[in-house]
């Protein structure tokens, strides 16, 4: 069984005559352990595709199955739980919580997650973040913020990691 599957998924923005199809009907399957790169020119729908995969948006049409279950009828609270437990997001602009110190970003995951997590000390060492833990995101360089965002995305041991230009701002 696929970890995630899209069946005839489309995404449209606007209304009436100003309707823009950002993603044409798309079928896609991702199996456990599989790595996939989505490439294409600017404006081709790559980010829209990733936000649909990660349940950050709902499709205009089609079905998204996660672990074989249709997620199209989930309420926002259930979708948020899916995002937290099943996905790690690494976005072009770091998605760290601005009012939490870096160490608190990880402690928040500790409090909210019931999953076994990746060893934080290993991530901190691997991504050279030891000196950043007591700082707020705004106090870090762009590269430090991006490395902290990568560590946070990996820390909850997600089934699926979605990265949209993850090397942006890395030093």
Predicted regions and their residues:
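ABC ATPase NBD coupling module
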Residues: 18-20, 71-88
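Helix-to-loop junction immediately C-terminal to a conserved catalytic motif
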Residues: 54
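Conserved ABC transporter NBD signature motif
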Residues: 62-70
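Conserved ABC ATPase "signature" region
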Residues: 70, 115-132
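Conserved signature/switch motifs of ABC ATPase nucleotide-binding domains
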Residues: 84, 135-138, 155-156
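Short coil-to-helix segment of the ABC ATPase nucleotide-binding domain corresponding to the Q-loop/switch region
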Residues: 100-107
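Conserved ABC ATPase signature
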Residues: 136-140, 144-146
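Catalytic Walker B motif of ABC-type/P-loop ATPase nucleotide-binding domains
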Residues: 161-164
């Amino acid at each position: 069984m696929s970890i995630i599957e899209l069946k005839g998924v489309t995404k449209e923005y606007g209304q009436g005559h100003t309707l823009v199809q950002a993603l044409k009907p798309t079928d896609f399957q991702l199996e456990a352990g599989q790595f996939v790169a989505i490439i294409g020119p600017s404006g081709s729908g790559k980010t829209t595709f990733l936000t649909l995969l990660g349940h950050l948006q709902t499709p205009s049409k089609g079905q998204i199955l996660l672990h074989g279950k249709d997620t199209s009828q989930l309420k926002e609270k259930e979708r948020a739980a899916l995002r937290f437990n099943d996905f790690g997001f690494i976005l072009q602009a770091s998605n760290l919580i601005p009012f939490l110190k870096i160490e608190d970003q990880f402690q928040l995951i500790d409090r909210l997650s019931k999953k076994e997590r990746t060893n934080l000390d290993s991530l901190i060492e691997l991504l050279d973040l030891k000196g950043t833990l007591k700082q707020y995101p705004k106090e870090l360089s762009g590269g430090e913020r991006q490395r902290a965002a990568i560590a946070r995305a990996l820390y909850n041991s997600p089934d699926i990691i979605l990265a949209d230009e993850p090397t942006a701002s890395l030093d």
